[in-house]
Amino acid sequence: MSGHSKWHNIQKTKGAADAKRSAAFTKIAKEIIVAVKQGGSGDPANNSRLATVIAKAKANNMPNDNIKRTIDKALGSGNTDNYESVTYEGYGPGGVAVIVEALTDNRQRTAPEVRHYFDKFGKGMGAQGCVSWSFDRKGVIIIDNEDGDYDEDTVMMDALEAGAADFAADGPVFEITTDPDAFNDVIAALEAKGYTFVSADISLVPQTYVKLTSEEDIKNMEKLLDMLDDNEDVQNTYHNWETED
């Protein structure tokens, strides 16, 4: 099976998360709290949203103790953390489509900050729906086979038998995509067979990609993504910039 791998689009984000692990854990903890409160349960078997966030936490090497403490905190009667999910859409340099998902306790703080990033480094923030139509929501699981521990055909068969929608190999990197509703089942089936992931989340995958040729556009796009990544309210940033291999 084939398809354009999004690995090149997340490599930079993954590296930034490794360099800023504490900040990454803080953002994931916020997602866990929201998942527990909205799902009404601290048991991932009874809370599919929590199960999805836990898969993301494990892929980011968040210790199990941290995950458990965060769940316990969310279940505690004294917890007053209240976050609202908000989504912003806009355009980066060269017309790159960008979607920003945030969890915030103050829209009046977050919206102007995100708008400033778009105005300074991109083409501005747009109305809801201006770019989201060009993305599909999918489960995306990334396996790194740089050490050659996995056989490509075996991984593909295991993934498809677990219910994955597609499989793509990009050098030593395997990308598995799923329907959102099948994501948790596929994760559980692959984990049961001993697979580990460098990334696992329900993501927005672009239908088409944009290449930037101007050095200025490339630098501004990198700055835009860095600013969004550094914002404590921003949880996820999706875009259709096709970086060079």
Which stretches of residues belong to each language-model region?
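Positively charged, low-complexity, intrinsically disordered RNA-binding extensions
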Residues: 140-245
